Amino acid sequence: MMPSARQVALANVVVDIEKGAARVGWDHAPSIYALVPTALLLSDPNLPADIAEQLRAGWDGSDEHLSAIIQEDLADDDIEQVLAHLAWPETVPGAAITVERIVVPPEVEDEAPEDPEEALAFVANHPLRTDVRLAVGVMRSGESWCALRTRAFDSDDKVGQGSNLVPALVDALRASLEPVTDEEA
């Protein structure tokens, strides 16, 4: 099955976000982005000329093409809490995030101490640890895309991609796009 134009646009912007994070380097706090149709941005008469020129340079001319607008850098230790309380206006059709994490094989996780601080130190200093950068994007219409880069294979041609590589992060980001009810407001 061929991916939809929206899925392709989402994949392209997520890969662009990840490449941008790679240019900055490792050991950075998470960043969150609003994903907005480029055509919508270009239709704004108040858009500064230099920004419009940059957008046009990367725009493929389609209505589905997305631009990422960075919102803020997030503290590394509260990402789940921030996503749980984040709400996007209805005018934002998608969102993305970049975050770095340490992963270890399941058997190493099983060996970790019960105490959360001790477990973090154990994993962070374990010889089988792997540093990864995740870029995840979701759309209100349901599409998702993930890009994963490891520090050990830090090259654009070694970035893993897929629609649901990090299900928990996809779900958390998708929840931030859900409409806020009167009870939650």
Label each region the model flagged:
Residues 31, 52-53, 92-95, 176-185:
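A contiguous, surface-oriented mixed alpha/beta subdomain in the mid-to-C-terminal portion of proteins
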Residues 63-131, 140:
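Internal, well-folded beta-alpha domain core
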Residues 1-3, 50-59, 110-119:
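Intrinsically disordered, low-complexity linkers and terminal tails enriched in Pro/Gly
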Residues 106-185:
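Glycine-rich, aromatic-bearing surface loops/beta-hairpins
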Residues 1-19, 23-26:
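Short N-terminal edge-element motif at the start of the domain
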Residues 40-42, 103, 142:
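Short loop/turn segments at secondary-structure transitions that flank enzyme active sites
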Residues 18-72:
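N-terminal interaction modules that seed assembly of large macromolecular complexes
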